[in-house]
C-alpha cells in the first residue's frame, strides 16, 4: 500500500472519481466529508471516512496528520444563492485551513482543484484561452470564489513552503453523480422541457478523466503549474440539440442579444424568489456566458 492521501470534498462527483483512481494506483485514502454527507459515491470503497468541516481548522489539521498529499476538492458548488458570502467563505477558509494543515503535517504537495471558471471566457469566438488567463469578474459567486481562493492558495503555498499544483476542470459530466448540481441541473431542465440554451461555447470533461488526472497529478504534476482539464468545446445550442436527439424532448434556444437575455434572466430570478426554486438562467450566468466563448 502506498502513502495516505487526504481528499477533501470526497463525497462529491469529482471526489468519488478521484478516489477510485487513487485506489487503483494503490494509495490509502482518507475521505474528508461533512457530517450527514451523502456518501452514495463512496459505498463499498476501502477508504477511511473523516468527518469535519473544511472551515474548521482543527478538524482539517487532524485529518491531514500522517498523509503525504492533500487533494482539495471541497467547495460550495452553486451558481445562485442568497448571499455571496455563503459561497466565498468556505472557499477562502478552506484554502487557509488546507495549507495550515499541510504545513503542520509536513505534507510535500497540495493538488488544488480550481475550475475553468477561474479562467473565464472571451467575447472573441476564435480566441483560445490558456492557463495564464484569469477571470476577475464577479458575475457568478462560485466563479469569483474559485478565482480568489486559487489566488490565495498560491500565496499560501509560498508562505508555508508547500508545493502546489492547480487543476482546472471544465464542466464535469459522467459517473457517480448522485446530487443535483448546476452542471447536471442544466441537462435535467432540458429533459424536463424547461431548460434553454444561449449563444456561447463551453468546455467539458468526463468525470472519470477528471478523477484520473487528479490522481496522476499526485505523481506527475509539476509544482507551481496550472493544468486545464477540458476536452471538446461545444456550443450550448449543440448540447441542447444532443439532449433533444437522445431524449426526444425539444430544447428551447434563445438566439437573443445579451441585453434581452439579461431581461429574461431578471424575470426568472423574480419568479425564483417567489417560488424559492433556483432559476434555470440568472443574470450572473447571462453576463458570464451569453455570447462568451470558453475554449482552452
Identify the role of each PLM range:
Residues 213-280:
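Mid/C-terminal beta-alpha module of Rossmann-like enzyme folds, strongest
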Residues 114, 149-175:
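Conserved beta-loop-beta element that borders a ligand/cofactor-binding pocket
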Residues 136-138, 185-209, 213:
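A conserved pocket-lining segment of Rossmann-fold NAD(P)-dependent short-chain dehydrogenase/reductase
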Residues 36-93, 101:
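NAD(P)H-binding glycine-rich loop region in Rossmannoid oxidoreductase-like domains
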Residues 142-147:
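Active-site YXXXK catalytic motif of short-chain dehydrogenase/reductase
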Residues 3-27:
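N-terminal Rossmann NAD(P)H-binding glycine-rich loop of SDR-like oxidoreductase domains
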Residues 72, 76, 82-141:
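Conserved Rossmann-fold NAD(P)-dependent oxidoreductase catalytic core, especially the SDR/UDP-sugar
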Residues 159-162, 174-185, 217-227, 249-251:
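Glycine/proline-rich active-site loop of Rossmann-fold NAD(P)-dependent oxidoreductases
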Amino acid at each position: 500500500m502506498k502513502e495516505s492521501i487526504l481528499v477533501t470534498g470526497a463525497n462529491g462527483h469529482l471526489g468519488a472519481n478521484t478516489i477510485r483512481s487513487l485506489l487503483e494506483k494503490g494509495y490509502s485514502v482518507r475521505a474528508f466529508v461533512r457530517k450527514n454527507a451523502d456518501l452514495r459515491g463512496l459505498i463499498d470503497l476501502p477508504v477511511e471516512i473523516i468527518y469535519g468541516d473544511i472551515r474548521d481548522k482543527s478538524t482539517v489539521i487532524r485529518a491531514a496528520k500522517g498523509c503525504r498529499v492533500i487533494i482539495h476538492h471541497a467547495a460550495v458548488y452553486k451558481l445562485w444563492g442568497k448571499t455571496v458570502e455563503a459561497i466565498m467563505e468556505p472557499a477562502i477558509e478552506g484554502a487557509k485551513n488546507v495549507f495550515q494543515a499541510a504545513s503542520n503535517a509536513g505534507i510535500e504537495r497540495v493538488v488544488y482543484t480550481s475550475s475553468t471558471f477561474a479562467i473565464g471566457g472571451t467575447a472573441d469566438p476564435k480566441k483560445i484561452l490558456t492557463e495564464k488567463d484569469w477571470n476577475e469578474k464577479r458575475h457568478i459567486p462560485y466563479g469569483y470564489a474559485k478565482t480568489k481562493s486559487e489566488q490565495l492558495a498560491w500565496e499560501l503555498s509560498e508562505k508555508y513552503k508547500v508545493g502546489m499544483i492547480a487543476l482546472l476542470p471544465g464542466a464535469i459530466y459522467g459517473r457517480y453523480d448522485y446530487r443535483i448540481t448546476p452542471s447536471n441541473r442544466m441537462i435535467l431542465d432540458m429533459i424536463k422541457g424547461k431548460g434553454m440554451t444561449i449563444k456561447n461555447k463551453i468546455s467539458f470533461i468526463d468525470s472519470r478523466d477528471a478523477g484520473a488526472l487528479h490522481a496522476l497529478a499526485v505523481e506527475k504534476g509539476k509544482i507551481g503549474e496550472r493544468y486545464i482539464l477540458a476536452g471538446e468545446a461545444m456550443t450550448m445550442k449543440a448540447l441542447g440539440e444532443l439532449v433533444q436527439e437522445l431524449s426526444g424532448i425539444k430544447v428551447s434556444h434563445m438566439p437573443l442579444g445579451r441585453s434581452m437575455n439579461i431581461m429574461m434572466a431578471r424575470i426568472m430570478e423574480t419568479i425564483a424568489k417567489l417560488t424559492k426554486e433556483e432559476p434555470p438562467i440568472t443574470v450572473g450566468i447571462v453576463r458570464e456566458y451569453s455570447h462568451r466563448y470558453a475554449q482552452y
